[in-house]
């Protein structure tokens, strides 16, 4: 009898162990991780840049050849007449990886400082974030999109993002479009007639600060809602959500620092307040989004497009998605031509 009871206890222990393993398996399969720990890339399906020529507004990729609209082919081919161009546009066969930025400018180049992050296991066994500066190079590779445009105006002109400006999923949505950002850096202005080589070398001093646009801020997938709660300790919902605060990366983070994912340490992170934040319905046709005021002459603007790693929507289930970036700038305030 004692031997039989011992066997029963052993079977119960085995059953309990199996149940614990199954339970742990469920936890692991439903966990979400910021910055992607699985497939770390996002496919770029299309980049559409369209600038409407209204009230004397014209655009160029080299400050030489002016037209009402520029294409991705124009941007990729800019070095033919703008030899020092650094236009980083990953091809449709390439991909993006999450990066983070607070909008700081490297005044030696005029580039916005971007940081590529990676999740590692800390000395205590938990997940930590490491980050290294990711600087753009000319070509069809890179972690993010960056390119220069030149806008010519005949008078002081306020320009706007139209309702045709948006970031959407290509095909089935993974939710990664909800972590996208677009930024505009005013690199400087020169009088019409200034040598193109001089205009091409304009560099931002950091003032004015870059215009950072957060898109699709009011929708999240179920996994992103969980990520917000479990990693960043924020409560949100899948639709009609309030904008969530986030802390962008502003410095390199070494593995030995053991910086946790939810850190707000001011040495490495800074709260980002986007210049514009719009929901999934986008910019309304009745009221375009104010972008910047252009001085008469030629203004160099550097444009960035990226997946923000510190956004709650940047999590494993969203990796491998496909994005389309569309951009249209106008001097009109609405679709009715006002």
Model feature map: region roles:
Residues 54-61, 169-197, 334-337:
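Short aromatic-acidic-glycine turn motif
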Residues 48, 53, 153-155, 186:
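Short, flexible loop/turn elements at secondary-structure junctions
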Residues 3-94, 317-338:
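Short, polar/proline-rich extracytoplasmic segments that appear immediately after membrane translocation
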Residues 63-134, 143-145:
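N-terminal pilin/flagellin-like segments and related low-complexity appendage regions
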Residues 80-103, 183-267:
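Low-complexity, serine/threonine/proline-enriched polar segments
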């Amino acid at each position: 009898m004692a031997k039989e009871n011992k066997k029963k206890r052993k079977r119960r222990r085995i059953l309990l162990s199996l149940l614990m393993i199954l339970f742990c398996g469920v936890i692991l399969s439903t966990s979400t991780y910021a910055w992607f720990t699985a497939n770390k890339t996002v496919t770029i399906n299309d980049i559409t840049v369209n600038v409407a020529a209204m009230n004397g507004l014209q655009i160029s990729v080299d400050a030489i050849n002016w037209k009402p609209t520029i294409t991705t082919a124009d941007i990729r081919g800019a070095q033919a007449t703008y030899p020092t161009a650094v236009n980083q546009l990953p091809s449709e066969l390439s991909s993006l990886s999450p990066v983070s930025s607070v909008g700081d400018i490297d005044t030696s180049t005029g580039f916005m400082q971007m940081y590529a992050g990676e999740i590692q296991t800390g000395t205590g066994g938990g997940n930590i974030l490491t980050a290294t500066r990711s600087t753009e190079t000319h070509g069809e590779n890179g972690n993010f999109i960056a390119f220069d445009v030149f806008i010519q105006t005949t008078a002081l002109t306020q320009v706007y993002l139209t309702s045709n400006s948006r970031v959407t999923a290509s095909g089935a949505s993974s939710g990664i479009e909800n972590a996208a950002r677009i930024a505009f850096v005013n690199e400087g202005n020169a009088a019409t007639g200034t040598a193109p080589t001089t205009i091409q070398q304009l560099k931002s001093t950091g003032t004015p600060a870059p215009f950072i646009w957060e898109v699709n801020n009011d929708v999240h997938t179920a996994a992103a809602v969980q990520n917000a709660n479990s990693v960043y300790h924020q409560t949100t919902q899948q639709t009609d959500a309030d904008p969530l605060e986030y802390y962008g990366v502003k410095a390199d983070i070494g593995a030995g620092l053991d910086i946790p994912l939810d850190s707000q340490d001011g040495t490495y992170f800074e709260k980002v307040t986007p210049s514009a934040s719009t929901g999934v319905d986008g910019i309304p046709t009745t009221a375009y989004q104010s972008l910047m005021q252009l001085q008469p002459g030629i203004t160099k603007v550097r444009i960035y497009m990226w997946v923000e790693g510190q956004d709650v929507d940047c999590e494993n289930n969203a990796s491998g998605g496909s994005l389309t970036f569309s951009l249209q700038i106008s001097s009109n305030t609405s679709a009715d031509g006002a």
